[in-house]
Amino acid sequence: MQPFDSGHDDLVHDVVYDFYGRHVATCSSDQHIKVFKLDKDTSNWELSDSWRAHDSSIVAIDWASPEYGRIIASASYDKTVKLWEEDPDQEECSGRRWNKLCTLNDSKGSLYSVKFAPAHLGLKLACLGNDGILRLYDALEPSDLRSWTLTSEMKVLSIPPANHLQSDFCLSWCPSRFSPEKLAVSALEQAIIYQRGKDGKLHVAAKLPGHKSLIRSISWAPSIGRWYQLIATGCKDGRIRIFKITEKLSPLASEESLTNSNMFDNSADVDMDAQGRSDSNTEEKAELQSNLQVELLSEHDDHNGEVWSVSWNLTGTILSSAGDDGKVRLWKATYSNEFKCMSVITAQQ
């Protein structure tokens, strides 16, 4: 393990690798985004560019899939999501290497999370913030990355939290291309799975129970070689929870559901009425007819304090968690399908 100095002047909120693991983007309360590249000869991380991106703390960033170019999305407490594209013709460390494509400013509250969808769903992203509304945007014309369309809105919280209260919101897309479009969303103490139905709209498919305090992080595991899905959460109560998600579908039904989901990938649906209320009857009906079964596989409190981040490896076999104890723990399933801590990493290693 080799640490590097980010050079930020304030708290670093997010650190994200690109698809190939050769670049790292960081964001901070100093309102700057920094991009580092890996030097193959020295294995050191070198600054590629740094720029002031928002008017308030930047709390989340994400890389788009590489087939759409080198694009970064950033979310901030200034209530905006901004998209950035690299210009390789500009000199490194000039502050001009990343150009702003557009600003998405539909949110009425501070934003906490932004994530690009898996590549097979097209160029789209989701964001979630303090107004309690999940928003999905599509680049309907990939040749024009400056034009993004708001295609879905879902009211995750009936009443948004007061500004003076501590809150947190996270989201994670289902990476499986063999499953209908789904994403897991955490808002305060609740975690919900949304799925796009045959009507082209997002509906509540399942809820992840048992959380008794703020959920700080949620991560949907890749399901390579596995017939079920895994979702992990990290919470303020110091616990890591790993859930098993089973889809009750026959192969024929799965194929039909996937086909119907793909038909509506680019549909412009808004799931709230003119007064901003979600169709609760439709959601309840969809939840009752949900094909998802949720089971709590493991629950651990090894960090002895708040858990701030959970993340899966590329194969979905190892989970990493980071907490207030200043340690990163790696978790792996045993033959009995129970997750055990296999390694503990500290900053001194």
Swiss-Prot record:
Write down the InterPro entries for this protein, in alphabetical order.
Sec13/Seh1_fam, WD40/YVTN_repeat-like_dom_sf, WD40_repeat_dom_sf, WD40_rpt
Q: Name one Pfam family in it.
A: WD40
The record's GO molecular-function terms, alphabetically, read:
structural constituent of nuclear pore
The UniProt record lists the keyword Membrane: yes
Identify its membrane topology class. Answer: Peripheral membrane protein
Subcellular location per the Swiss-Prot or TrEMBL entry: Nucleus, Nuclear pore complex; Nucleus membrane; Vacuole membrane
Q: Which Gene3D superfamilies match?
A: YVTN repeat-like/Quinoprotein amine dehydrogenase
Output compositional bias ranges, type Basic and acidic residues. Answer: 274-285
What are its GO cellular component terms? nuclear envelope; nuclear membrane; nuclear pore; nuclear pore outer ring; Seh1-associated complex; vacuolar membrane
| Location of the region described as Disordered in the Swiss-Prot/TrEMBL record | 263-285
The role this protein plays is:
Functions as a component of the nuclear pore complex (NPC). NPC components, collectively referred to as nucleoporins (NUPs), can play the role of both NPC structural components and of docking or interaction partners for transiently associated nuclear transport factors. Involved in nuclear poly(A)+ RNA export and NPC biogenesis. It is also required for normal nuclear morphology. Component of the SEA complex which coats the vacuolar membrane and is involved in intracellular trafficking, autophagy, response to nitrogen starvation, and amino acid biogenesis.
Q: Which PANTHER family match?
A: NUCLEAR PORE COMPLEX PROTEIN SEC13 / SEH1 FAMILY MEMBER (PTHR11024), NUCLEOPORIN SEH1 (PTHR11024:SF3)
Miscellaneous note of the record:
Present with 952 molecules/cell in log phase SD medium.
Q: Output this protein's name.
A: Nucleoporin SEH1
What organism does this protein naturally occur in? Saccharomyces cerevisiae (strain ATCC 204508 / S288c)
